[in-house]
Amino acid sequence: MKRLKKLTREPGVFFRDYFNKKYPVRNIEQRINEIEEPAIIANSLHLAAVESAIHLSPFKIDVVFTWVDNSDTQWQQRHQQYCHAASPNNLYSNDETRFANHNELYYSLHSVRSFLPWVNHIYIITDSQTPKWFKSAEYPNVSIIDHSEIIDKQYLPTFNSHVIEAHLHNIPNLSEHFIYFNDDVFVARPLHREHFFHANGIASLFIADKSLQKMATKGTITPTLSASQNCIRLLNQRYDCNLDHPLVHTYVPLRKSGFQTAWQYYREEIKAFLPNKFRTNQDLNLATFLVPWLMYLDGKSIPNNDICYYFNIRSNKAPTQYLKLLQKNEDNQQPHSFCANDFHSEQQLYDYHAKLIAMLKDYFKI
């Protein structure tokens, strides 16, 4: 009877709810339907606010970006000199989308400064590059860190993000607690520090609802997938566990001590892949798999939800996500974050770069 009344009084709402239940929409890499997102976000914001009131002695939290400008001629020359080292057997290891610069860093950095005002310091790791728009006077709490400051010269130059990420803990003056960003990840709304690190220092672990085993069975073996599988083999040697999930494509809360532990346990295995100039199937991905899961296994992190909209900017489905994000921004129903990933698509969107930048400008009111 209630359903009949709803159908006659509010047919639009009735059919919306019916199709949402029958064909749930998922925007993220966790088992959460779009209709469930507002409640989960509201709950996470409430819990973070409650925990922030505990007033434990606050610890500093930094942010680390890795960034490359592939339009830089000097970088292109270095890249050309070594690109023969990229094996054709390692899928996408030297794909141009891996190094494409769409100026996302400007907007991602803006999202951090706008929505995470409690961040202590921001570090941008580059290969002898500085963003053209960067002026130190305008960004007093942002430092540019060159690869040579954190990576042994015998491994330079490197175009392998796994190698770069293996050395994040070497950043001078980096705080024990930090959040790692790729430049295609954006904070979508104001967030408490407790969303990333609990007041007692325990980190959040944003686990994707994906199976690495199933991904491998499909036959598309990428260096990222291989690196995760390599990490699992190492962790299984020391821990009695059954890991099969990657992390959500969003920011990653990390601790320097987690990297130090990884290097202590697996130094020889890490050093073995550092000479790889480009991603290979023999790599380890420390920042986005080995260290976060090592922290979890050592009781230094716990699973948490992050509603992160994840999409391919080259896909013809991207504009739908842009409209959805802009509408949710207007309605104050924003996700925690979103990732504007760049990889090849069979049905490639025309002028995808311009459409992305237009959305970012509109979303962040720049």
UniProtKB/Swiss-Prot annotation:
Is Transferase included in the keywords of this UniProt record? yes
UniProt record, GO biological process:
polysaccharide biosynthetic process
Decide whether keyword Acetylation is in the record. Answer: no
What Enzyme Commission number(s) apply to this enzyme? 2.7.-.-
Q: Which InterPro entries match?
A: Stealth (IPR047141), Stealth_CR1 (IPR031358), Stealth_CR2 (IPR021520)
Query: Which enzyme class?
Result: transferase
Q: Which family does it belong to?
A: Belongs to the stealth family.
Q: What else is known?
A: Stealth proteins are part of a protein family that is conserved from bacteria to higher eukaryotes. Family members were first identified in microbes as proteins that help pathogens to elude the host innate immune system. Microbial stealth proteins are involved in the biosynthesis of exopolysaccharides. Stealth proteins are predicted to function as hexose-1-phosphoryltransferases.
Protein name stated in the entry: Capsular polysaccharide phosphotransferase LcbA
